[in-house]
Amino acid sequence: VFGDLDLIGVIGEGSAAASVDGTWYGSLDAVDAASGYWVQSNVDGTVDVCGDPADDVVYTLHDANNLISYSYGESQAIGDALPDNVEDEVFAIVGEGIASINMNGFWVGSLNSFDAGSGYWFARSADAADITFQYNVPTAGDARLLSNELPVVPEEYVYNQSTEQGFYFVE
C-alpha cells in the first residue's frame, strides 16, 4: 500500500506493525481508508500511498479518541471540513506536532486545516454516542490562507517528533 519509502513502523488506533529485516510484525495487517495512520521511518521522505482515491469515505467516531484519515486531495479549514453536528461533538483535534481545541464553536490552536494524506486524533467525551459523518467536499478557496506550517526551528533546538506527544490547553 505504501510506496517505496523505507518504513520501520506504522501506528494505527489500537494497532501497530514494525518491520524487522523486511518482515512485518504486529497487530496491523491491513489499512483502511477511514482510519488514520502514523508512519515511522529512519529517513526523511514523502509517503506515497498506492491505490484508488477515496473521497467518499464514511467515518464513525466512537467515544474518547479516534485516529482517522483526511481523504481529500485538497487542504480544508477545520470549520469548513466538518459538518456542524460533528463539530459540536468534538472537543479537540491533534495532528503531528499541532493541535486545536473547540472553544464555543471556534477552533483555537496551531492546527488550522486538514491536509491531504494526514491522519488526525479526534477527541470526544468518554460517554459520547457513536456518530457517523463524511467530510464536507472542499470548494475552491476553502483553505484560503490557512497553513499548518510551523516556524523554522533554530539548529540548536532541532528535535525529532515523538509519537508520544502531549498537548495542554490552558485558559
Where are these regions (language model features)?
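Aromatic/hydrophobic beta-strand junction motif of beta-rich domains
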Residues: 168-171
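N-terminal exported-region signature
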Residues: 1-164
